[in-house]
Amino acid sequence: MSLLTEVETYVLSIVPSGPLKAEIAQRLEDVFAGKNTDLEALMEWLKTRPILSPLTKGILGFVFTLTVPSERGLQRRRFVQNALNGNGDPNNMDRAVKLYRKLKREITFHGAKEIALSYSAGALASCMGLIYNRMGAVTTEVAFGLVCATCEQIADSQHRSHRQMVTTTNPLIRHENRMVLASTTAKAMEQMAGSSEQAAEAMEVASQTRQMVQAMRAIGTHPSSSAGLKNDLLENLQAYQKRMGVQMQRFK
């Protein structure tokens, strides 16, 4: 796996699923391929994206700044600086300085990542802030190692939280989760279907599902009534794709 592929993988792991994630993935691919060279426009685009947490925006801004060539005097962006200040906690800043001194002696991506993984996400973000604000300089490889370690720490806590929700025995939470998944799957189906004649059927199924979920929420239904909703929808989607000559087995 190449270095940039690894960086893209880690960064995307902390971005919530949805159309925005696909957009960010495309931007990262363009940046890493050298196709997008307007850093200012890229940062303005990132700043106005909804849904993303300030820290995720800060990390993406840091990656874009590392990768896109820019004039020396280009102003640093406040939204990135604020996100990478370790919540203003002096302990984070102290640890960040110690980490920075270690990273300065390191030259490889994997070496930097190994060192960084023993620090908290707050200290890692503060260390990125030091480098972003030009208070410290490390090689691009080392900076990417720091980025990936930070993303791994964040993704780990997201995964633990997600696992707790998926394994919960509370029927009301499970019911709501199934309805949310069915609704987002329906939305994705509508986007994928496009405007061809064959798409009308898929659109109809997706629309009916969304209406059903709205009705279930409006009138309040038994927690078991949502069982299988998402899987029924995915079976319809796969049948539609088969007719269109597309084989996608990875949805379930």
UniProtKB/Swiss-Prot annotation:
<comment type="function">
    <text>Plays critical roles in virus replication, from virus entry and uncoating to assembly and budding of the virus particle. M1 binding to ribonucleocapsids (RNPs) in nucleus seems to inhibit viral transcription. Interaction of viral NEP with M1-RNP is thought to promote nuclear export of the complex, which is targeted to the virion assembly site at the apical plasma membrane in polarized epithelial cells. Interactions with NA and HA may bring M1, a non-raft-associated protein, into lipid rafts. Forms a continuous shell on the inner side of the lipid bilayer in virion, where it binds the RNP.</text>
</comment>
<feature type="region of interest" description="Membrane-binding">
    <location>
        <begin position="1"/>
        <end position="164"/>
    </location>
</feature>
<keyword id="KW-0694">RNA-binding</keyword>
<keyword id="KW-1048">Host nucleus</keyword>
<keyword id="KW-0946">Virion</keyword>
<keyword id="KW-0468">Viral matrix protein</keyword>
<dbReference type="InterPro" id="IPR036039">
    <property type="entry name" value="Flu_matrix_M1"/>
</dbReference>
<dbReference type="InterPro" id="IPR015423">
    <property type="entry name" value="Flu_matrix_M1_N_sub1"/>
</dbReference>
<dbReference type="GO" id="GO:0003723">
    <property type="term" value="F:RNA binding"/>
</dbReference>
<dbReference type="InterPro" id="IPR001561">
    <property type="entry name" value="Flu_matrix_M1_N"/>
</dbReference>
<dbReference type="InterPro" id="IPR015799">
    <property type="entry name" value="Flu_matrix_M1_N_sub2"/>
</dbReference>
<dbReference type="Pfam" id="PF08289">
    <property type="entry name" value="Flu_M1_C"/>
</dbReference>
<dbReference type="GO" id="GO:0016020">
    <property type="term" value="C:membrane"/>
</dbReference>
<dbReference type="Pfam" id="PF00598">
    <property type="entry name" value="Flu_M1"/>
</dbReference>
<comment type="function">
    <text>Determines the virion's shape: spherical or filamentous. Clinical isolates of influenza are characterized by the presence of significant proportion of filamentous virions, whereas after multiple passage on eggs or cell culture, virions have only spherical morphology. Filamentous virions are thought to be important to infect neighboring cells, and spherical virions more suited to spread through aerosol between hosts organisms.</text>
</comment>
<dbReference type="GO" id="GO:0046761">
    <property type="term" value="P:viral budding from plasma membrane"/>
</dbReference>
<dbReference type="GO" id="GO:0055036">
    <property type="term" value="C:virion membrane"/>
</dbReference>
<feature type="region of interest" description="RNP-binding">
    <location>
        <begin position="165"/>
        <end position="252"/>
    </location>
</feature>
<comment type="subunit">
    <text>Homodimer and homomultimer. Interacts with NEP. Binds ribonucleocapsid by both interacting with genomic RNA and NP protein. May interact with HA and NA. Cannot bind NP without genomic RNA.</text>
</comment>
<comment type="similarity">
    <text>Belongs to the influenza viruses Matrix protein M1 family.</text>
</comment>
<dbReference type="GO" id="GO:0039660">
    <property type="term" value="F:structural constituent of virion"/>
</dbReference>
<dbReference type="InterPro" id="IPR037533">
    <property type="entry name" value="INFV_M1"/>
</dbReference>
<keyword id="KW-0472">Membrane</keyword>
<dbReference type="GO" id="GO:0042025">
    <property type="term" value="C:host cell nucleus"/>
</dbReference>
<feature type="short sequence motif" description="Nuclear localization signal">
    <location>
        <begin position="101"/>
        <end position="105"/>
    </location>
</feature>
<protein>
    <recommendedName>
        <fullName>Matrix protein 1</fullName>
    </recommendedName>
</protein>
<dbReference type="InterPro" id="IPR013188">
    <property type="entry name" value="Flu_matrix_M1_C"/>
</dbReference>
